Amino acid sequence: MQNNNTAISQLIEAGKWVSQKEWIPATGGNFSARTESGFVITASGQDKGKLTSEQFLQLDLQGKPLAGTKKRSAETQLHLSLYQLIPEAQCVLHTHSVAATVLSQITKSHKLDLTGYEMQKALTGFTSHLETLSIPIFNNDQDIDHLSLLVSDHHLHTPIEHGVLIRGHGLYAVGRNIDEVRRHLEVLEFLFSCELERLKITGIQASNNNK
């Protein structure tokens, strides 16, 4: 388990990378990482491409503040829930890309199924493009406690592996370390972009593929 300073440094670098990819406009999204004392997370309303160490909060795994004076994001609770649900998860990156936002909005099902893409094999646990990747989709909800409960209920019968989509909102990518999360994030964003382009070309509604 890494210390707070190391985790913050890695998240600052991740913020620059994600910002350059244009997956997190304005001050949206939030990043977190597990630490020896709990986890660190970006404060509310921060430009993720220009993060400094003062823009992070340190919390324990019950959500109790340990350090930091800036405003806590309401979405902190969802990060906390993901860490509690997935003990091996060490990092969560929440982004607001166009592809993730639009696909989650037009997909009427509560999951986005993707198959046939070679890049699926870059996700932990996948060995073939013939396998089906299912990313759960949850309706956006300003009541984060309620949203977290829905995510928890889903995880009980269908464990969350690579991330979750929030409808019309964005992606929460998870992994066993920050490098794995960055890989998962990049792969998922690539797949979302491919699927969105495919739907534009074929004219097939996303809901038809995810009944």
Curated annotation (Swiss-Prot):
One of its GO terms (molecular function) is methylthioribulose 1-phosphate dehydratase activity. One of its GO terms (biological process) is monosaccharide metabolic process. Pathway: Amino-acid biosynthesis; L-methionine biosynthesis via salvage pathway; L-methionine from S-methyl-5-thio-alpha-D-ribose 1-phosphate: step 2/6. Zn(2+) binds at residues 94, 96. One of its GO terms (cellular component) is cytoplasm. The keyword Metal-binding applies. It holds the Pfam family Aldolase_II. SMART domains: Aldolase_II. Belongs to the aldolase class II family. MtnB subfamily. Catalyzes the dehydration of methylthioribulose-1-phosphate (MTRu-1-P) into 2,3-diketo-5-methylthiopentyl-1-phosphate (DK-MTP-1-P). PANTHER family: METHYLTHIORIBULOSE-1-PHOSPHATE DEHYDRATASE. NCBIfam families: PRK09220.1, salvage_mtnB. HAMAP family: Salvage_MtnB (MF_01677). This is Methylthioribulose-1-phosphate dehydratase. The lineage of its organism: Bacteria, Pseudomonadati, Pseudomonadota, Gammaproteobacteria, Alteromonadales. The gene is mtnB.
